[in-house]
Amino acid sequence: MGITPTALEKTDKHTLVNLQEEFNKTKIQEVLDDLNQELIGLKPVKNRIREIAALLLVDRLRQKVGLSSSNPGLHMSFTGPPGTGKTTVATKMADILYKLNYIKKGHLVTVTRDDLVGQYIGHTAPKTKEVLKKAMGGVLFIDEAYYLYKPDNERDYGSEAIEILLQVMENQREDLVIIFAGYKEKMDKFYASNPGLASRVANHVDFPEYRPEELLKIAEMMLQEQQYQLTKEAELVFLDYIKKRMLQPHFANARSVRNAIDRARMRHANRIFNLSSKIVTKSNLTTIQAEDILKSRLFNT
Ligand SMILES: Nc1ncnc2c1ncn2[C@@H]1O[C@H](COP(=O)(O)OP(=O)(O)OP(=O)(O)O)[C@@H](O)[C@H]1O
């Protein structure tokens, strides 16, 4: 079709070389490796982020060699229960977008409804615009985004904030990426009530709830970072603790695990402090024992 096989081959070869070079240049692999190392589990999320990164990279490359670019939508939706790594992954996503030159600064600004919506007439627009100003050049992460929309209250100022966000999403695509986050079911309802907004959110990532064994691994990783470890017995007790905690109200996955660890460290310190011998070994200082966890009120009920 006008192109000789040799010419086509040459172009193909040329493009292939560019892809590899471009990929190396962006240092995206480092971000993906960090993501892999820092977060336990989350396989589907990690795969999805890799897919999005690949799409964005290929699109950049197509632009470079003069091919049509589909102009990929950059706004995203991260759904899942609290403490499942949405904010952590959003930080990495911001870095990827920055490295691919889609945004100029690459920082993450995390907000909730209260940061965007005022309580009185005339307060919402300046509040939302102030947040947008801070987030320009980076990623705006709106946690529990569905609280922006209150269908029962016609005069709620949340819709004013949504209007402003919509304008920015459409007109300043070069400067700002928005990630809407929250529970899946509530987000689905939010999108259904705001089709204009939904149509501008191109990438959806769903964060699954962690299994107890994954939460134990997360705990062990967090402890290791702080140079602590669990005894074998403490491991089993902690797993038991997690299973009990999951059934309690306000359970927030890895965040609840982090809080539990903080409390276990407190009890550990107390135990060490009360030891009859005031000479302690390094192992005393680093080892969390079963009793440090068993003293949690969860085991007294
Ligand atoms: N898979 C994981 N491996 C290791 N640490 C994790 C993992 N998931 C979450 N964490 C840690 O748990 C804490 C909470 O995670 P993060 O804030 O990213 O969750 P979130 O889904 O954004 O929660 P929320 O929506 O409630 O703000 C962070 O300290 C994070 O490092």
Curated annotation (Swiss-Prot):
This is Protein CfxQ homolog. Belongs to the CbxX/CfxQ family. ATP binds at residues 80-87. One of its GO terms (molecular function) is ATP hydrolysis activity. InterPro entries: AAA+_ATPase, AAA_lid_6, ATPase_AAA_core, CbxX/CfqX_mono, CbxX/CfxQ, CbxX/CfxQ_RuBisCO_ESX, P-loop_NTPase. It comes from Cyanidium caldarium. It holds the Pfam family AAA_lid_6. Keywords: ATP-binding, Chloroplast, Nucleotide-binding, Plastid. Necessary for the expression of RuBisCO. The gene is cfxQ. It is found in: Plastid, Chloroplast. GO terms for cellular component: chloroplast.
